[in-house]
Amino acid sequence: MTIGIIGAMDEEIALLKQQMKDMEELEVAGCYFYTGHLHDKSVVLLLSGIGKVNAAMATTILHERFSPSMIINTGSAGGFASDLQVGDVVISEEVLHHDVDATAFDYVYGQVPGMPATYKADQRLVELSSEVMKDIEINSRIGVIATGDSFMQRKDQTDIVKQRFPGMLALEMEAASIAQVCYRYNTPFVITRALSDIAGQESSVSFDQFLQTAGKNAAQLIINMVKKI
């Protein structure tokens, strides 16, 4: 069994790298793969780069090179629910693209032609994530995570996405692409995102200020999940 763990930025995987043993590094097309062990489990930690194309490419290379048994995507996101705070974690029940529009061809908004409207996370991994969050006493919610190639800093941007997807809990830039690749490879996945900012509320300042806190909480979740897998 090989567990694939994906993060977009150095800050999102730094603590995980520190915990790995027997680590080796491989660079492919600008993506960095760190193989080794975490709690005696075989893991491949992937630094994918930011955005949907980078995430999809990196996740595909991960599958072709390492054939992961499951994928856990860690990192940060912007929160939407009023009861969520910076540092809280959102666990994906399902993931979708918020910036895809093929409605002219009778697809629902957010649906890539030929693909499902949403990508459902593996229920066992979702339940494990939720269980671990209770153990380490970090607030979490299970729900919808939306992905697009924009950092949502302005209220008018976030209002549009909220209107289209009122049940969304978090917004970020890689998860749906990772989920789509996992769907094609039939690989179980879960997305876990710690909130580094509240979308639409001075996001650029808040993101920089709280990224390390979000990264720490996300890493705690992954480390404890791997221990129980």
Curated annotation (Swiss-Prot):
Transmembrane segments: none
A GO cellular-component term linked to this record: cytosol
Protein known as: 5'-methylthioadenosine/S-adenosylhomocysteine nucleosidase
Function, as annotated: Catalyzes the irreversible cleavage of the glycosidic bond in both 5'-methylthioadenosine (MTA) and S-adenosylhomocysteine (SAH/AdoHcy) to adenine and the corresponding thioribose, 5'-methylthioribose and S-ribosylhomocysteine, respectively. Also cleaves 5'-deoxyadenosine, a toxic by-product of radical S-adenosylmethionine (SAM) enzymes, into 5-deoxyribose and adenine.
Catalytic activity: S-adenosyl-L-homocysteine + H2O = S-(5-deoxy-D-ribos-5-yl)-L-homocysteine + adenine; S-methyl-5'-thioadenosine + H2O = 5-(methylsulfanyl)-D-ribose + adenine; 5'-deoxyadenosine + H2O = 5-deoxy-D-ribose + adenine
Upper lineage: Bacteria, Bacillati, Bacillota, Bacilli, Bacillales
Presence of the UniProt keyword Transport in the record: no
Gene source species: Oceanobacillus iheyensis (strain DSM 14371 / CIP 107618 / JCM 11309 / KCTC 3954 / HTE831)
EC numbers on record: 3.2.2.9
InterPro entries hit by this protein: MTA_SAH_Nsdase, Nucleoside_phosphorylase_d, Nucleoside_phosphorylase_sf
UniProt keyword terms in alphabetical order: Amino-acid biosynthesis, Hydrolase, Methionine biosynthesis
One GO MF term attached to the UniProt entry: adenosylhomocysteine nucleosidase activity
Annotated disulfide bonds: none
Residues given in the record as substrate binding sites: G78, M152, M173, E174
UniProt-listed Gene3D superfamilies: Nucleoside phosphorylase domain (3.40.50.1580)
Pathway: Amino-acid biosynthesis; L-methionine biosynthesis via salvage pathway; S-methyl-5-thio-alpha-D-ribose 1-phosphate from S-methyl-5'-thioadenosine (hydrolase route): step 1/2
PANTHER family for this protein: 5'-METHYLTHIOADENOSINE/S-ADENOSYLHOMOCYSTEINE NUCLEOSIDASE, 5'-METHYLTHIOADENOSINE_S-ADENOSYLHOMOCYSTEINE NUCLEOSIDASE
Gene this chain is encoded by: mtnN
Family: Belongs to the PNP/UDP phosphorylase family. MtnN subfamily.
Active-site residues, as the UniProt record annotates them: E12 (proton acceptor), D197 (proton donor)
Keyword Hydrolase found: yes
Pfam families according to UniProt: PNP_UDP_1
